[in-house]
Amino acid sequence: MENLEQTCASLRAQIAATEAQLAGLKRDLEVAEQAAAEIKAQDVKSTGIREEGSEKKNPWPLLSEEYKRYGRQMIVPQLGLQGQLKLRSARVLIVGAGGLGCPAALYLAGAGVGTLGLVDGDTVEHSNLHRQVLHRSKNVGKFKVDSAIEYLRELNPHPTYVPYRAHLTPQEAPEIFKDYDIVLDCTDNPATRYLISDTAVLLGKPLVSASALRTEGQLIVLNNPPRPVGDKSGGPCYRCVFPKPPPATSVVSCADGGIIGPVVGTMGVLQAIEAIKVITSSPADETSASPPSLLIFSAYSTPPFRSIKIRSRRANCAVCSAEASVTVETLKTGSTDYVFFCGVAGPETLLRPEERITPLEFKKKHPGQVSHEQELGGSKEPTIIDVREQVQFDICSLDNSINIPISTILSSAASPTTSTPESLPSWLPHDIVSSSSTDPIYVVCRLGNDSQIAVRKMKELGLDQGGKRFICDIQGGLRAWREQIDPDWPEY
């Protein structure tokens, strides 16, 4: 019976997803038909057609409306009419319709690229809106590519917009990339970055890659000029610059590390600029191009920009060298495993079940403030240690909790040989380290990972007094607290 219910639920979910996709396609068709009608009407007006049989060919390469729309950039010497014509015939693929992809798509659509493809399987969330400038509040829950294209069509109906409502996979990447001239990597995870770079090299596509976190960003143009595999004169790929991926546990997302909107917006706009430069360049520009470099942006530094030269193609690169082991075939067959290559951090499970407690269990065990009578009766009052960084603790915190950031805890020296108050770190409050105190300690963080690390560290320091004192983490962190205890708890 349970299996049948799961099957029914799965089928309902598939039907709902299919209906949503169909509705999205219908909207795309309606907007496309409207845009086509507007362009046709403009074309009729600009060519002076009065009636059937009296057609007059437009003597100019652009429509009258296009001269007005793009005139301010066409009078720039680096672009000109020929540059605009190159833009109009260009096919640009943007992977990721988030903080980087939105401003990049916005300016490329505004510049008049001919075809703009958007790849993203995510839907719009409220937490996206402060930085992902193509999405609006009314589109929360909608596929990001649909939300973005809706905005872009209002900005400029001339380009052809192609949505890909799924995350990029190795099997599908070559088939998608082959239809485009240049690719923009606007994603935020290493596995996808390597996949995008590998596919771009194998299919001969220049790649503009960027990243942003907190107040900093990076930008690099890869595989430019795009030369065949084994040709040392080609631009380096992502593997040439970063042969080994960072440890999975060291990768910090915007959700964990934070991001200032204009920082990621700056990087996305820079991606659009680099894409326009590549599209409008000439063969002579390729021969005289500057060595590849990594542009680093730091919003709170002076000066905010600096550039680092990077090496050319590596002689032993797994993708672009003569010794390449990654091919289109290995992508399509799945034998190139990007998740295995980059590793997966996943949720931490460092503690035994008896060292963890759910928010609901904690609430049942400690329903409220311990009264004076209870204290006299020998009941132990819990100590809650919040190991989030102070900037997060200041946003919201549990009543009577103590803030000791995980960074402070991890900076402690090796475990002491004794657990006397004098041997314990100074960051621990005196009443906690007192040898007479056996009050239980509950450790909480945002998601339930750092709290486990902190519990293990505290026990290594001897704070549990050889097992006499109960120390555990609140499983799932403050996100679980919101789900189980307080639905009004701020979610950030």
UniProtKB/Swiss-Prot annotation:
Span of domain Rhodanese: 378-490
Gene3D superfamilies assigned: NAD(P)-binding Rossmann-like Domain (3.40.50.720), Rhodanese-like domain (3.40.250.10)
Enzyme active site: C254 (glycyl thioester intermediate), C445 (cysteine persulfide intermediate)
Known EC number: 2.7.7.80, 2.8.1.11
Pfam families: Rhodanese (PF00581), ThiF (PF00899)
Top EC class, one word: transferase
Matching PANTHER family: ADENYLYLTRANSFERASE AND SULFURTRANSFERASE MOCS3, UBIQUITIN-ACTIVATING ENZYME E1
HAMAP family: MOCS3_Uba4 (MF_03049)
Function per UniProt: Plays a central role in 2-thiolation of mcm(5)S(2)U at tRNA wobble positions of cytosolic tRNA(Lys), tRNA(Glu) and tRNA(Gln). Also essential during biosynthesis of the molybdenum cofactor. Acts by mediating the C-terminal thiocarboxylation of sulfur carriers urm1 and mocs2a. Its N-terminus first activates urm1 and mocs2a as acyl-adenylates (-COAMP), then the persulfide sulfur on the catalytic cysteine is transferred to urm1 and mocs2a to form thiocarboxylation (-COSH) of their C-terminus.
Name this polypeptide is given: Adenylyltransferase and sulfurtransferase uba4
